[in-house]
């Protein structure tokens, strides 16, 4: 599935000091500024050993953050995983639905399902393959999207 499942959960955006809505060029600027600041070659030779090790660890984290957020594909996967984690933290799954049970909307190329509150669950065709949790656009209910094997 996603490469992020093996990596301990880290907020790569906060490591770069960026907002999740930041553009790739903004992320790159923050990365470049931080990577220079924490680069091992830029550290003072007379700095305490613990301080140097902390800088090296921070340098590695900044580099990892950029490798994930600087690549369009891995950034998309990471953002989807963050979104699903946020939904999981909102509460339990209300129902498990197969994609085939949802209605296809040709106008906006999305699948949708009515919620018991009158709102709807919707997911684009592209997202349908990747997301597993969908929130109602009106209330706090969440469904789990299942796929036939």
UniProtKB/Swiss-Prot annotation:
Coiled coil: none annotated. Pathway: Protein modification; peptidyl-diphthamide biosynthesis. Keywords: Cytoplasm, Cytoskeleton, Electron transport, Iron, Metal-binding, Transport, Zinc. InterPro entries: DnaJ_domain, DPH_MB_dom, DPH_MB_sf, J_dom_sf. Pfam families: DnaJ, Zn_ribbon_CSL. One of its GO terms (molecular function) is ferrous iron binding. SUPFAM superfamilies: Chaperone J-domain (SSF46565), CSL zinc finger (SSF144217). It is found in: Cytoplasm, Cytoskeleton. Residues 11-82 form the J domain. One of its GO terms (biological process) is positive regulation of ATP-dependent activity. Zn(2+) binds at residues 115, 117, 136, 139. The keyword Acyltransferase does not apply. GO terms for cellular component: cytoplasm; cytoskeleton. CDD domains: DnaJ. The DPH-type metal-binding (MB) domain can bind either zinc or iron ions. Belongs to the DPH4 family. Stimulates the ATPase activity of several Hsp70-type chaperones. This ability is enhanced by iron-binding. The iron-bound form is redox-active and can function as electron carrier. Plays a role in the diphthamide biosynthesis, a post-translational modification of histidine which occurs in translation elongation factor 2 (EEF2). Monomer and homooligomer. Iron binding promotes oligomerization. This is DnaJ homolog subfamily C member 24. It comes from Bos taurus. The gene is DNAJC24.
């Amino acid at each position: 599935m996603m490469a992020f499942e093996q990596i301990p959960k880290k907020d790569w955006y906060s490591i770069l000091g960026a907002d999740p809505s930041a553009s790739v060029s903004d992320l790159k600027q923050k990365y470049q500024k931080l990577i220079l600041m924490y680069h091992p070659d830029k550290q003072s030779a007379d700095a305490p050993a613990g301080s140097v090790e902390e800088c090296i660890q921070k340098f590695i984290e900044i580099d990892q953050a950029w490798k994930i957020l600087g690549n369009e594909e891995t950034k998309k996967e990471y953002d989807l995983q963050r979104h699903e984690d946020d939904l999981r933290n909102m509460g339990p799954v209300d129902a498990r639905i197969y994609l085939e049970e949802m209605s296809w909307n040709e106008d906006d190329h999305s699948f949708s399902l009515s919620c018991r509150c009158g709102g709807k669950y919707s997911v684009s065709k592209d997202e349908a393959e990747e997301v597993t949790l969908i929130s109602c656009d009106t209330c706090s209910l969440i469904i789990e999207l299942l796929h036939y094997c």
